[in-house]
From Swiss-Prot:
Catalysed reaction, written as an equation: a 2'-deoxyribonucleoside 5'-diphosphate + ATP = a 2'-deoxyribonucleoside 5'-triphosphate + ADP; a ribonucleoside 5'-diphosphate + ATP = a ribonucleoside 5'-triphosphate + ADP
PANTHER family: NUCLEOSIDE DIPHOSPHATE KINASE (PTHR46161), NUCLEOSIDE DIPHOSPHATE KINASE DDB_G0292928-RELATED (PTHR46161:SF3)
Organism of derivation: Rickettsia akari (strain Hartford)
UniProt family annotation: Belongs to the NDK family.
Protein localization: Cytoplasm
Kinase is among the record's keywords: yes
Gene coding for it: ndk
Protein name as it appears in the record: Nucleoside diphosphate kinase
A Pfam family that the UniProt record links to this protein: NDK
Residues engaged in binding ATP: K11, F59, R87, T93, R104, N114
Named cofactor requirement(s): Mg(2+)
Enzyme Commission no: 2.7.4.6
Function: Major role in the synthesis of nucleoside triphosphates other than ATP. The ATP gamma phosphate is transferred to the NDP beta phosphate via a ping-pong mechanism, using a phosphorylated active-site intermediate.
Length: 140
C-alpha cells in the first residue's frame, strides 16, 4: 500500500443542499484525511481549463455552466491508495448505477449533479491538485 494524495471537488449541487459535512464524513470515515480544503467560485475560464480534456465532448458546455453555477469545495485528500479509495467512496459517476453507501448513490441527483468529482489517476491527481493549490496550502 502506498500513501497518496488525490484531488476532490464537492460540486455546487451538494453545496446548495448543505451536504459539505456529510461528504466530508464519507471521506474521513472511509479512511481519507483532508489535508487542504477551500470553498470558492470557479470562473468560466478556470472551469474550461480544468475540464479541457472534455472540450470536444457534447456535454462540455453544460458541464462548465453547471460547475460555475455555484460555489465548490476544493480538497486535497491523503491516505493509503487514496486515488482508488476516493473513487470507491464516491461511487459510480451515475448515481443510479452507484452502490448503496457511496456519496453519489446517497447524495447525487444526476450524472452531472452527482455531488463530487475525484481524480481518476496519479497524473490527474497531480495536475488537479497543482491547478488549485500551492504547497503551502497543504497541511500535513
Amino acid at each position: 500500500m502506498t500513501i497518496q494524495y488525490t484531488f476532490s471537488m464537492i460540486k455546487p449541487d451538494a453545496i446548495k443542499r448543505n451536504k459539505i459535512g456529510q461528504v466530508n464524513a464519507y471521506l474521513e470515515n472511509g479512511g481519507l484525511k483532508i489535508v487542504a480544503q477551500k470553498m470558492r467560485f470557479l470562473t468560466k475560464y478556470e472551469a474550461e481549463c480544468f475540464y479541457d480534456e472534455h472540450r470536444a465532448r457534447t456535454f462540455f458546455n453544460s458541464l462548465v455552466e453547471y460547475i460555475t453555477s455555484g460555489a465548490v469545495v476544493l480538497q486535497v485528500l491523503k491516505g493509503e491508495d487514496a486515488i482508488i479509495l476516493n473513487r470507491t467512496i464516491m461511487g459510480a459517476t451515475n448515481p443510479a448505477e452507484a452502490e448503496a453507501g457511496t456519496i453519489r448513490k446517497d447524495l447525487g441527483e444526476s450524472i452531472e449533479a452527482n455531488s463530487i468529482h475525484g481524480s481518476d489517476s496519479e497524473n490527474s491527481a497531480k495536475r488537479e491538485i497543482a491547478f488549485f493549490f500551492n504547497k503551502s496550502e497543504i497541511i500535513e
